[in-house]
UniProtKB/Swiss-Prot annotation:
Domain tr-type G: 502-678
Ranges of Low complexity composition bias in the record: 105-115, 187-212, 228-242, 361-380
Source species of the chain: Koribacter versatilis (strain Ellin345)
Ranges for region G3: 564-567
Name used for this protein in its record: Translation initiation factor IF-2
Length: 1011
């Protein structure tokens, strides 16, 4: 059974702290609180200890007087609210003490000090009042009912009755100022009276001072009458001891300690000492009126402790210049009959600020020149002191952050850090060794609102790092992953090199179109890839892995990866991309054609990629083959054959006859061995996207070349702006794979979106990290596209004005693979001229869909499909909307058709043919016909259906058609040179003698050029 410490404290009527202290005394070492529980035997020990030793009271409780602890009042018989007050009154009123027997007068105990002194000064009255009757009249008050005994200064001093001698003429008393309660007025020095007067003391009587009691000073009981407080003095020597007053002890009798009753709360500001009258102050010079506010202040300014409005009272009774309480002239005596008037509560005391302070007055001991301001609130009893500026409660200990303007100065650069693209605020703060909220505050001052997980641009991250004293090296996300992987593996560069193994070389085949690149690859792979290409032309990159199967070859069993690139001039980007991911470039040149433009371009790409070049001279089986001419042409381009003393390998091959194919592969392996191609298969995979396409049944599909590490199914990866998870992998022959080592081309499924060809492929362990990087890159690409499309400049405006009359041909392009779409985009954009501009509305990979048809209908565009077909519903919708869909599989045909479409947009050309000229000899007017010109044909022939121009003074006046042509009175179809005729111009009659009429014909012909 357990008992709570709170319950035990209430049972023993002690505080919980006493229980906790007793627990330590009885041997309980376990830490307890007031809400903890203890066992029964521990409670017994605590009770025994408290009964034997008691509890330690607090210093405040020990220092409290006996009267602080009052007995309780029994409220069990209370039935209505009035009984509570009655019980309190009975409890507080002690029984009156029995009257003491009469005894002779004795000297007052120590509280009364009798010292011979000149004129005695009575103690100041406790509550001065204005005399309502003559000063000599004594006011008798009825006896007071029994009240609680309070120790007052008056009760300590000897109480004696006032002896009233005969009443001589009383001189006018000095004016006594009336002050509010709790303010002690100093009494004027007592003058020696000629005769005894009430409230006066004989000259030889010693002064009686009332000691300052530490107890509370009780105010006098209100009897309902105006009482004139008079100072009491000791009786003359030999005077009889007066009878005791009811309710008061005899003089000199010590007070009997009474039983403590209920403490009464008396509203007092503090103990009031009794002051004796100060000596008369010397007269002070009257200050000038304008300086009455106080020294050092401007006239009219309010002064601390002075009334705000120092107005001069008006004359008249109670306020006139000489009336009672009226304005007193400075330094002048009061007029006879004037009654004193109390000062304003905020007016300074005549001798300075009051000792006890007050509203608007300086407290005792305060400096006189304390600046004015709002007074500090007084602390409640028991409230501890809290320094200004410190917070309490839930905000205790909170330190506000420094103002942003205080840390605008950047720190000196003392270190270097490496950051990646799209670094988050949290990661950057960790690299800088600062708190994330400090970095966010700096970004906020920069005008950037960012959260902890928000990514930052590389430029902004570098700026923030420089501000906090660090320089930066920006790397890509793939480089960062490679560094983290190497760091996690804990390998040194030497160990990493030792763990690397030889990988198959990646060979890219380049050359001019129709020089036999794909046929050569087919002969090596023993397949027919070229037969499947449209028109026998390779139009996208193909990746294949081939193993040397000739047992007689020294390279038997080795593998080679081949990349087949297009040879058409439009596929420059594909060739450039293929050269970047390759180890060796094989330039295929036809022996009968020689070096062609795309051959030179392929050589330039290989040199730019700094990869070795092998030349394969194909078609040597043809009768007109000239391999030596090819060597000479390439030697002029800088590729010197080995048999001519150079370092370029030349191999004469025939794809059709399969001649020297093993020799070509052996040379490839030899050059690869010189390059020391190695990779670490134990790392996470990384590579490059060769091609990407959108499959109808499988979704986005990408052909990836693994360059390092091993790719496995279920791996998460990032590739450009896309990310995904490897759902399945297939090799170049369509066989499913679970793993793919270095230098292995695979087709992967599991992409969220379609990547771009040439993007870096990297496997990551965290899918969320891959998603964040993908979203960051996609957002950056979108922002760049919007900025590019919305940018307006003066040059752009001038270009728009220049091409205001330019025709626009909108196109929607769909292709089978991403590489082909990129190539066609570049090709069509280059076909734009000053007269016709091709606008690409949308381009993408996949079949033609209904959304493509609707977009084409809204924008009046033509849909072009390259190696793709429209869906059935899309075809029906295109017929309904009247959208033109053009399908192509060969790039040449697409290029020719686009030229025809562009020419069809141009306006037809108007061609004029000159026929003849006639001179006007005279004119005459025929009613209902108009003006007829009598002409003579001077040159050529004038026909009835000809167009004519009327020329006057070598200026064309009118152009129209012949309305009538007559020879004499007969209509004529034509009039030849030298003959006269009458010519009427349709709709025109202002013909004059001497004009010339020229006849011509016009015809429209189609534009034959785009320039």
């Amino acid at each position: 059974m357990k008992i709570r410490i709170n319950d035990l404290a209430r049972e023993l009527e002690v505080k919980s702290k006493a229980i906790l202290d007793a627990l330590t005394k009885v041997g309980v070492t376990e830490k307890k609180t007031h809400s903890s529980s203890i066992e029964d035997h521990e409670a017994v020990l605590v009770k025994k200890y408290i009964h034997e030793h008691g509890t330690e009271e607090s210093p405040r409780r020990r220092s409290a007087g006996e009267d602080e602890f009052k007995p309780k009042i029994d409220l069990s018989k209370i039935s209505k609210p009035g009984d509570v007050l009655k019980a309190l009154t009975q409890k507080a009123a002690p029984p009156p003490p029995p009257p003491p027997p009469p005894r002779p007068a004795v000297k007052a105990p120590s509280p009364v000090s009798q010292e011979p002194r000149p004129p005695a000064v009575p103690p100041a009255p406790q509550k001065p009042a204005v005399f309502a009757r003559p000063a000599s009249e004594t006011v008798h008050t009825p006896p007071e009912p029994p009240k609680p005994r309070f120790i007052t200064p008056a009760s300590v001093a000897a109480q004696r009755p006032v002896i009233t001698p005969p009443k001589p003429p009383v001189p006018p008393a000095p004016p006594v100022a009336v002050a509010p309660p709790a303010v002690i007025e100093p009494a004027a020095p007592a003058e020696e009276p000629k005769a005894a007067a009430p409230a006066t003391t004989a000259p030889e009587a010693p002064e009686v001072k009332a000691p300052v009691s530490p107890e509370r000073v009780a105010p006098a009981a209100d009897t309902g009458a105006h009482v004139t407080a008079k100072p009491e003095a000791p009786a003359a020597p030999g005077a009889a001891t007066p009878a005791p007053t009811p309710g008061r002890p005899l003089p000199g009798v010590p007070l009997r300690q009474q039983t403590p009753g209920r403490r009464m709360i008396v509203p007092q500001t503090g103990p009031r000492p009794v002051y004796s009258a100060p000596p008369p102050a010397p007269p002070r010079p009257t200050p000038p009126p304008q300086m009455s506010q106080g020294a050092g202040t401007r006239p009219g300014m309010p002064v601390r402790g002075q009334p705000i409005f120092q107005r001069r009272p008006q004359s008249g009774p109670g306020g006139g210049s000489g009336g009672p309480g009226g304005f007193q002239r400075p330094g002048g005596p009061p007029r006879p009959g004037d009654r004193p008037r109390g000062p304003h509560p905020t007016r300074q005391f005549p001798s300075g600020p009051r000792p006890m302070g007050g509203i608007g007055l300086a407290p005792p001991g305060a400096p006189a020149n304390k600046p004015a301001g709002r007074p500090a609130p007084a602390r409640r009893p028991g409230q501890r002191y809290v320094p200004r500026g410190q917070k309490e409660g839930p905000m205790k200990g909170f330190v506000p952050p420094p103002r942003l303007s205080l840390s605008n100065e950047p720190l000196p650069i003392t270190r270097n850090i490496t950051i990646s693209e799209g670094i988050s605020v949290k990661d950057l703060a960790e690299k800088l060794g600062i708190r994330a909220k400090d970095l966010i505050a700096r970004l906020l001052a920069r005008g950037v609102f960012a959260t902890v997980n928000q990514t930052l641009e590389a430029s902004l991250a570098s700026e923030m790092a420089n501000h906090f004293g660090a320089s930066t090296d920006v790397i890509t996300f793939e480089d960062q992953l490679a560094q983290e992987t190497a760091k996690a593996a804990g390998e040194t560069p030497e160990e990493a090199a030792a763990n690397a193994v030889v990988r198959p070389p990646v060979v890219t085949i380049m050359g001019h179109v129709d020089h036999g690149k794909t046929s050569l690859l087919d002969a090596i792979r023993a397949t027919d890839v070229a037969g499947g290409e449209a028109g026998g032309i390779t139009q996208h990159i193909g990746a294949y892995k081939v193993a040397i199967g000739d047992p007689n070859s020294p390279a038997f069993g080795r593998e080679i990866v081949f990349l087949d690139t297009p040879g058409h001039e439009a596929f420059t980007r594909m060739r450039a991309r293929g050269s970047k991911i390759t180890d060796i470039v094989v330039i295929v040149v036809a022996a009968d054609d020689g070096v062609m433009p795309q051959t030179v371009e392929a050589i330039d790409h290989a040199r730019a990629a700094n990869v070795p070049i092998i030349v394969a001279v194909n078609k040597i089986d043809k009768p007109d083959a000239m391999p030596e001419r090819v060597k000479k042409q390439l030697a002029d381009r800088g590729l010197m054959p080995e048999d001519w003393g150079g370092n370029t390998v030349f191999v004469d091959v025939s794809a059709k006859q399969k001649t020297n194919l093993n020799l070509l592969m052996e040379m490839i392996c030899l050059v690869a061995d010189l390059g020391d191609l190695k990779a670490n298969p134990d790392r996470m995979a990384s590579g490059t996207v060769v091609e990407a396409k959108l499959d109808r049944g499988r979704g986005p599909v990408a052909t990836v070349l693994v360059q390092n590490g091993t790719l496995r199914t279920s791996d998460n990866f990032v590739v450009g702006n896309a990310f995904g998870k490897v759902r399945a992998m297939f090799n170049d022959r369509g066989v499913s794979l679970d793993t793919a080592g270095p230098s292995t081309p695979v087709e992967i499924i599991g992409l969220e979106t379609l990547p771009q060809a040439g993007d870096q492929f990297t496997v990551v362990a965290d899918r969320e990290k891959a998603r964040d990087i993908s979203e960051y890159r996609e957002g950056r690409a979108r922002e760049a596209q919007l900025a590019k499309s919305s940018r307006v400049s003066l040059e752009g405006l001038a270009e728009q004005l220049k091409t205001a009359g330019q025709k626009d041909l909108p196109i929607i392009l769909k292709g089978d693979v991403q590489g082909s779409v990129e190539v066609l985009n570049d090709l069509l954009s280059k076909m734009s001229t000053e007269k016709v501009k091709i606008t690409m509305i949308r381009s993408g990979v996949g079949a033609i869909t209904e959304s493509d048809v609707l977009l084409a209908s809204a924008s009046n565009a033509i849909i072009i499909g390259f190696n793709v077909r429209p869906e059935r519903k899309a075809q029906e919708l295109a017929v309904q909307e009247g959208v033109d869909i053009r399908l192509h599989s060969i790039i040449y045909e697409l290029q020719d058709e686009m030229k025809k479409a562009m020419l069809g947009l141009l306006e037809p050309i108007i061609k004029e043919t000159y026929q003849g000229r006639a001179d006007v000899k005279d004119t005459f007017r025929i009613p209902k016909v108009g003006t007829i010109a009598g002409c003579q044909v001077a040159d050529g022939i004038i026909k009835r259906d000809s167009h004519v121009r009327l020329v006057r003074d070598n200026v064309v006046i009118y152009t129209g058609k012949i309305g009538s042509l007559k020879r004499f009175k007969d209509d004529a179809s034509e009039v030849r040179n030298g003959m006269e005729c009458g010519i009427g111009i349709a709709g025109y009659g202002d013909i004059r003698s001497g004009d010339v009429i020229e006849a011509f014909t016009s015809e429209k012909i189609a534009a034959d050029s785009l320039h």
